[in-house]
Amino acid sequence: MKKIISLLVCMFLLTSYSITAQKYKRKKQQNTTQFEEKYYDAMQWRNIGPYRGGRSAAVTGVANKANLFFMGATGGGVWKTTDAGNSWENISDGFFGGSVGSVAVSEWDNNVIYVGNGEKTVRGNVSSGDGVWKSVDAGKTWKHIGLKNSRHIPRIRIHPKNPDIVYAAVLGDLYKSSAERGVYKSINGGLSW
């Protein structure tokens, strides 16, 4: 008798769950806005860049400038757009290239940009980098400011009111022990860590 009651309770619970799920699915479908195909059938996809960038996991915007974004590519340096992505310009060529794991722009002074080299997506084949780079003129020029053997820097954070205070999360060598690994702090704009 206990088995029959248990079986009936289970069937009841499963049935009520199924009914609830169907109601939710129908409700969700009713709220979907659909547009007639004539409004978008002439549209065509196009690549707006950046070109030769490779994959990217390092993208940041600038809080008070809605159309300004920076992107760090795994195989193509740092790119900048001032028109919300319609066009891109490489701003690191001639200074550094290769793999970028993080890009940070100061909220206090948008001309100050820090870049951490080295891919941050840990995979079988990753590109390493050579530390932290800094620009004080919105990417026109760059200076290497340390952590040369860090290899992979997935995150950089800048103090919101003082661009000289910066933190860098450093992975170091992914496949063996590494002297440069951990969270580093600079209080002098990267002169020392």
Where are each of the predicted segments found?
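Bacterial Sec-dependent N-terminal signal peptides
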Residues: M1-K25
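Beta-propeller blade termini and top-face loops
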Residues: Y17, Q22-W193
